[in-house]
Design a protein with these regions (language model features):
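Well-ordered, non-membrane alpha-helical segments in soluble/globular domains
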Residues: 17-27, 108, 140-146, 231
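Short, aromatic/basic amphipathic alpha-helical patches
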Residues: 46-61, 79-80, 172-173
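Active-site-proximal specificity loops/subdomain of glycosyltransferases
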Residues: 58-118
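Short, acidic, metal-binding catalytic loop of nucleotide-sugar glycosyltransferases
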Residues: 23-36, 55
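Short beta-strand-to-loop element that shapes/binds the nucleotide-sugar donor at the catalytic cleft/hinge
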Residues: 157-170
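N-proximal low-complexity "stem/linker" segments adjacent to membrane-targeting elements
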Residues: 1-23
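Catalytic core and acceptor-binding pocket of nucleotide-sugar-dependent glycosyltransferases
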Residues: 135-139, 179-279
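GT-A fold catalytic core of metal-dependent nucleotide-sugar glycosyltransferases
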Residues: 99, 104-160
Length: 279
């Protein structure tokens, strides 16, 4: 194996009902063959998963369930800041809860834990893959060895969903105040980088975790909005673009992530770029 992914399942007030995520989850769990998967959840979540899925899914030697209560997340230390942030997060606070926003920022910490604790023997690459990433069905060829070995070990890979926004965003991010934050805050409605998947060489994971965490704390310290993972991601990327490689370059406005019924749209949607690139 050359890659280990982290993912998670927690019962939170999310974008879709639980049954929808369980349907997508089946697509992922059915074809964990070319990579290792560490699935973080809590005690309630593990009971639900083992009740919903046949036992053979979790007999796969490449799948490891790890119980990690929300209170033990790295980002839980910022609980008060997350709650305060959610109160002013007008685009999302009527649809989701603050814990979901915290989860979006926890992804790199889950990946780093999978790397450090070595639930599987160390692999060359580590990454994050949303539990609902395979909406159109299983992908048995996902992350086969030649595709993983072709990755640049010096880059952190994400998907670009709207390149036309980057010129304006670059001007915003690079005009910083004395604290190192954008002088004019990043617009909360921008969507530029897909946070549902990333992959990087194991030597880049701790540095990326540290960069993300420092940026997040800076936003909280100065009461800047953290709408979801979008704002922190694009700030990090445009502050140090040499560390990243963005996949996908088709122009146009950012499409809305597809619903559970739009399989063809999912295959073509830049939010799911790595389903194609590594599939």
């Amino acid at each position: 194996m050359y890659v280990t992914f982290a993912t998670c399942w927690y019962s939170l007030n999310s974008k879709f009902p639980a049954d929808t995520y369980l349907h997508w989850m089946r697509h992922m769990l059915a074809e964990v063959t070319n990579y290792n998967l560490v699935l973080f959840t809590d005690a309630e979540g593990e009971l639900l998963l083992r009740d919903h899925f046949a036992p053979y899914y979790f007999k796969n030697p490449h799948i490891k369930i790890v119980q990690k209560p929300i209170e033990n997340w790295h980002n839980y230390q910022y609980k008060d800041s997350w709650i305060k942030n959610h109160a002013k997060n007008t685009l999302l606070n009527g649809k989701t809860e603050w814990k979901l926003n915290m989860l979006w920022a926890e992804k790199i910490n889950f990946v780093n834990e999978a790397r450090i604790n070595q639930y599987f023997p160390e692999t060359d690459f580590y990454g994050w893959c949303d539990i609902g990433y395979f909406r159109e069905g299983p992908c048995p060829t996902f992350c086969n060895t030649p595709k993983i070995l072709a990755l640049n070990k010096n880059k952190i890979y994400y998907a670009c969903v709207n390149p036309l926004q980057f010129t304006a965003l670059k001007e915003i991010v690079q005009r910083k105040n004395e604290y190192g934050l954008p002088l004019v805050p990043i617009p909360p409605d921008q969507a530029s980088i897909a946070g549902g998947f990333f992959i990087a060489h194991h030597s880049k994971i701790e540095g990326w975790r540290k960069m993300f965490d420092e940026k997040l704390r800076l936003y909280f310290q100065h009461n800047y909005l953290v709408k979801d993972d979008q704002i922190i991601l694009v700030d990090c990327f445009l502050s140090e673009p040499q560390r990243f490689e963005l996949r996908g370059s088709a122009g146009g406005s950012a499409p809305t992530p597809p619903s559970e019924s739009s399989a063809k749209q999912s295959l073509e949607n830049p939010w799911f770029e790595f389903r194609r690139f590594l599939g």
